[in-house]
Amino acid sequence: MAHKKAMGSTENTRDSNPSYLGVKSYGGEHVHAGSIIVRQRGTKFHPGHNVGRGSDDTLFAKDHGVVKFARSGGDRKYVHVVPEEA
């Protein structure tokens, strides 16, 4: 038996960083323009009124208001931002 480990023993020590995906602002919460609402991979949630979609499918608020989650048609889920009235 070898008393020293063979080369390559530390091959499996790498790990990727966490993505921190999920809903960041829930329904009924107040958000400012530019606030991230959902971090996701793919379009589990689709952008609705006053909501934009980033290149990595992140949904963000385009206007100040209240977050609202809704279902439309089949199983498609939308996220809207209802503007606050001054």
UniProtKB/Swiss-Prot annotation:
GO MF annotations, alphabetized: structural constituent of ribosome
GO terms under biological process: translation
Name of this chain's protein: Large ribosomal subunit protein bL27
Family: Belongs to the bacterial ribosomal protein bL27 family.
HAMAP family for the chain: Ribosomal_bL27 (MF_00539)
Keywords: Ribonucleoprotein, Ribosomal protein
Compositional bias annotation for Polar residues: 9-19
Keyword Nucleus assigned: no
InterPro entries xref list: Ribosomal_bL27 (IPR001684), Ribosomal_bL27_CS (IPR018261)
Annotated segments matching region Disordered: 1-24
GO cellular component labels: cytosolic large ribosomal subunit
Highest taxon above the source species: Bacteria
